[in-house]
Amino acid sequence: MQFKDHPKQYKPKVYLIQEIPGTNKGEPKYNIVGAQKYGEIVTMLPEFSQMIHSPGPLIYKLRTLLKNYTSEDYLLLSGDPAIIGVVCSIVADTTNGRYKLLKWDRQEKTYYPIEINIYQK
């Protein structure tokens, strides 16, 4: 899997790792509409997905879902912490350790982009 840079007309995506709790009941626990200003929201996994004893099939599925991830895209970290860790690992592996995520600020009630470079000293 190769990391891709897209031309300027590319519309970024916000990869929501897991559906927001309560989505299945039609009552999401929190609203992520504010993340749309950073790109189209792409939901990767259903609300109740879990990492199990044999994570191989889930890792394969996540790699497939992230195959078009680019330097312009963002991760929106929601869901099972083990799955979040795997997603960040996959993205870091394909982007030479550089990726962006959205951080919710409770006081300002807005998302802030954070650029991660795991090799930065």
Q: Residue locations for each model-derived region?
A:
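Long, low-complexity, Lys/Arg-enriched
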Residues: 1-74, 86-121
